[in-house]
């Protein structure tokens, strides 16, 4: 039955139990047999995943390599109905709008030969009643004036309650009340380090996961290098004061264009990185700066076009001697 299910996931457009079962017309069985595999069979998903990873690591094309990269992200699994456990009405940042979906958090492995997930876990919507009761039981006070928001503005109540949870999540018992996507990512990375301590692969992620506490966890607790993604509103500290990265990039761009026009040495340098057998070109600035809330970081600002007419990308890393080529190559492996 497991072979039938796996084959169906690979080749069937309809990945329901009924749809997969209908594929097997020669050796047909009642779909209840396949359903029992998923609902009543005692197999361990974690043990199955470890066997999958062991198989991948036994093959030269898919084994973990010294230049491999780990990336953290989450994926929406869209549904066209609402009657599913753990489903939520979530914003689709790729296609826009909101959709009913499950949200799968992924720890992914990538190198120039292969890509595959290492670990994955379903994010579950916050149980606000559980969090409220749990915080009070742990002696963490909730402001009396906020309780009216339950009826008048449920969205603000949710934001307030999760804010209290977030600020206190380092205290005993608080983290267990709710597993945010960041906490799931932390747990998967901790599992990876525990299972494969010899590997110190860099971790990369988008701007949603680039948060100070998560970066400190990777640096101080796991000892892993990381490449994050900053936004144009993040701030860099310069001798003359703190400015946004957008302002800083605009200043660099103008200085670069003026210098090049007068025959001087360019401020942004042309770099090339290998990716999946191809070579990609960027125009890059790389220096160590103090980034607000992150401390001292290696900052990379990349443009795609030689005339710098496009919007720049901003990357940060805890490896202060790394150069823009290495940082950009690592970030490129976030699929």
Give residue ranges: language-model regions.
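An anionic, glycine-rich sequence signature occurring as long contiguous blocks
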Residues: 113-170, 174, 178, 227, ...
